[in-house]
Curated annotation (Swiss-Prot):
Family the UniProt entry places it in: Belongs to the TrpF family.
A Pfam family: PRAI
Protein name: N-(5'-phosphoribosyl)anthranilate isomerase
SUPFAM superfamilies named in the record: Ribulose-phoshate binding barrel (SSF51366)
Pathway(s): Amino-acid biosynthesis; L-tryptophan biosynthesis; L-tryptophan from chorismate: step 3/5
Amino acid sequence: MPLDVKICGLSTRATCDAALAAGADMVGLVFFSASPRHVDLGTAADLARAAQGRASVVALTVDADDAQLAAIVETVRPDLLQLHGRESPARVAEIKRRFALPVMKALPIATRDDLAALPDYAAVADRILFDARAPKGATRPGGLGVAFDWTLLRDLELTLPFMVSGGLTLDNVADALRITRAGGVDISSGVESAPGVKDPELIRAFIRAARATERLSV
């Protein structure tokens, strides 16, 4: 199965164009004011139009209410909703039903115990994103450049598509894919020159590294 590469936290047309030209399968737009990657609806709509027909547009929210989600869906018209907060399985199911869009639920991972919630989320989400659990005191749940122990997913039995995130770089993406056998990778801080500032060359280099791993696995 082809590998999905997602570049998350894009906030400018230049970096979005760089990700698209490099072959990103998904572009992630962040709607969370505590993040340096947060975009307003107007900017997000412009980036989504640029990506239309070239990559899937993913709207990342954190414990968003229906009003915020409705505004995003109406204005940006994303292909996928990424729920990156503490949304319960019931809330995930409700959002999926209300907005009639596929949903990817992020699960924070630090120890094997964190996988206990997986079956309940897998029953309602369309895709799972395994991300590193944020350190204590962090003001946002992801995009922190922190990795988790990928071997926790080594014997994972999951029929649902899943991606890995957290601390990925062009130097470790091959190991992450080899160990987890994930169907996709999601990167944000690993392709930045500063928090929230995407680097087009790092984007290109990461996608090349991920694609090289994909070719080796064929």
